[in-house]
């Protein structure tokens, strides 16, 4: 889950307001099933789910913010987003066909009719660990800056340890 936490921290430019976690140690002393809810000061909420014992290996991140709900499945990989467009810019994309996977649905609410836009992105599947190793080697050879530097890695680890601590306390 530490990699998923790192991804969330890189996507959300805000301080963490609160962490909630639940899970279980089923096979031994390590957490095998983990659910974490990270709430940021900006109002963004990220739900992370990870399981080492499920029939299908699970790594999903769900983020919620005003007018946008995103589900990222890191195993497939794919990203699905539901956007309530208040600016009508997505409506133009649908009309012009500039975003092929984008669909539009109208929903009647107490505030009137709202448009919800659904988009599904399926990025090229890559071996994340191999990419990370290659980036590390490249940084050594070129004295470059890694995608995840020590400070960012430490922050992700601190959050992961806090999640583990909360699971242990609650379990």
Language model region names:
Residues 2-89, 126, 130-143:
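Contiguous beta-strand/loop segments that form the cofactor/metal-binding neighborhood of enzyme cores
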Residues 15-17, 75-78, 101-103, 112-118, ...:
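Generic structural motif recognizing short loop/turn segments at the entrances and edges of beta-strands
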Residues 41, 121-123, 130-171:
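C-terminal helix-rich "cap/oligomerization" subdomain common to oxidoreductases
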Residues 66-68, 92-93, 167-171:
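Juxtamembrane/interface motifs at transmembrane-helix termini
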Residues 77, 97-101, 123, 146:
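Proline-rich intrinsically disordered, low-complexity coils
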Residues 85-119:
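Charged, glycine/proline-rich intrinsically disordered loops and linkers
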């Amino acid at each position: 889950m530490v990699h998923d936490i790192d991804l969330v921290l890189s996507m959300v430019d805000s301080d963490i307001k609160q962490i909630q976690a639940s899970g279980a140690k089923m096979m031994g002393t390590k957490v095998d099933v983990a659910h974490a809810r990270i709430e940021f000061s900006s109002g963004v909420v990220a739900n992370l789910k990870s399981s080492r014992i499920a029939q299908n290996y699970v790594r999903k991140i769900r983020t919620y913010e005003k007018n946008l709900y995103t589900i990222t499945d890191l195993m497939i990989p794919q990203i699905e987003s539901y956007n309530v467009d208040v600016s009508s810019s997505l409506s133009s994309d649908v009309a012009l066909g500039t975003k092929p996977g984008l669909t539009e649905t109208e929903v009647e609410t107490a505030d009137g009719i709202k448009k919800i836009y659904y988009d599904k992105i399926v990025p090229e599947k890559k071996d994340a660990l191999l990419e990370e190793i290659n980036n590390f080697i490249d940084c050594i050879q070129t004295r470059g800056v890694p995608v995840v530097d020590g400070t960012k890695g430490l922050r992700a680890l601190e959050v992961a340890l806090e999640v583990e601590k909360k699971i242990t306390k609650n379990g």
